[in-house]
Every structure is written in structure tokens, then in C-alpha cells.
Amino acid sequence: MKVVEQLKIEETQDLLIVSVKQQRLYHQKEGKSVKTYVASTSLKAPSCKEDSLGTPWGLHEVCEVIGVGQPLGMVFQGRKPIGLHHWDCEEDMQQKNLITSRILRLTGLQEGLNRGGDQDTFKRFVYLHGTNHEDRLGRPASSGCIQLGNQEVIDLANQVSSGSHLFISLN
């Protein structure tokens, strides 16, 4: 990948590619396609800026996998399970985009684009995570995060590890 070469970092065994235009996440292992997932990115225009609620683009790294061992549909707040499945939450809470099942926390790798200053993916708490609104997958629906179905994010979290690259493309 050209960006990896420019940044002078090693490619990782697993590569996740998110297409904002197609609302898909592509998983590659050692350069071979593993699986394609239907995803959702931000309802607002893509953006790397703080408080924009846009999905940031460029090269990222999965810096933490959170929630391994938690049941499907578990709701997280502040990256901690709250002890409720999304279907057990009050109606007003269910209206929100909840963070469910697993969290792959992201950190940007491109200084000035998605790392540092007011354009820092990690400080913006942009994740790849499950959603309580699986019916919205395939179209922009999030507040900046990348959303997958609950079973899909569990499966993905079981296959990738911290340090894996995730590239978010506007195409």
C-alpha cells in the first residue's frame, strides 16, 4: 500500500479497508480477500476535524480490541460494558446510535491528517463497533464511527489484533 511506504512502516498481516462511497469494509489477510462487510460511516460529510462528527480518512491502526468475551448486543459506554443488551435498554436510549458488541479502537497514523492537533482520530474516540441499528447498515448513519452488524464485529474482532492497519478511503 502506497501510504504505508510513504510513512515507512511495515504492512500488517491483516488490512481493513473502509470505502465511504460504497459503505463497505473489506478484510484482507496477507494481500488476499477474506470477507466483505456491509458498514455505515458518518451521516455527516467525512472529516478528520474534531467535533465534525465526520468519519476520518487515511491510514489508521487498531490500537485496542475491547469487549472480547462480552455477549452479542452488549452496550458500551466509555468503552466499558454497562450490563445491558441494546434490546433491553429504555426506548429513548435505543433511539441513539449505541456502541455494541465489540470496539476496535483506532489511532491515526498520518500526522496532520488524522493524528495530532484538532485532527486526531484517537482523541476523537472514533471506533469500529457494532450497532443497535443494523437496519441502517449500507448507508451513512453514524456520528463518525464505522459501524458493523453485531455478529460481524464479533467475528472481525476475533480475527484481527491490535496493530492491524485500517485504511479509510473516500472512494
Tell where the protein language model's regions lie, with residue ranges.
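Glycine-rich catalytic cores of cysteine/serine-nucleophile enzymes that process amide/ester linkages
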Residues: K21, S33-H60, I66
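His/acidic/aromatic-lined binding-pocket segments of jelly-roll/cupin-type domains
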Residues: L15-V18, C145-I146
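Extracytoplasmic
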Residues: E11-Q13, V20-Q22, V34, W57, ...
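Exported/periplasmic cell-wall-interacting domains
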Residues: L72-N171
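Short, conserved beta-turn/loop elements at beta-strand boundaries and strand-helix junctions
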Residues: E30, G67-P71
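Short beta-strands and strand-coil junctions in structured, solvent-facing domains, enriched
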Residues: R24, P46-S47, G69-Q70, L113
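N-terminal post-signal-peptidase region of extra-cytosolic proteins
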Residues: M1-D14, V38-S52, H85-E90
